[in-house]
Amino acid sequence: MKTRLRVLRAEKEWSQAELAAHVGVARGTINAIETGKYDPSLPLAFKIARAFGKNVEEVFLYPEEQD
């Protein structure tokens, strides 16, 4: 799943560790989400979106459906 985490973190000047602390996970979890190696649970996705003051859909981008 693609995300806007790097862009949003840059806007707030947050490191991965700072975002991780805000949402209660390890820095490695944020790294794995950003690199597409891990899809967050729904509760974690909401926590991350809330940390940025965004809706989940503004942070996590669903791949386009293919015919």
Ranges and model annotations:
Residues 50, 60-67:
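Short, charged recognition helix plus adjacent turn
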Residues 43-58:
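DNA major-groove recognition helix of helix-turn-helix/homeodomain DNA-binding modules
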Residues 25-38:
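Recognition helix of helix-turn-helix/homeodomain-like DNA-binding domains
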Residues 3-22:
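Short basic helix-loop element that most often maps to the first helix and adjoining turn
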Residues 37-47, 65-66:
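Short, basic-rich loop-to-helix N-cap that marks the start of a DNA-contacting helix
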Residues 18, 29, 58:
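Residues in the helix-turn-helix
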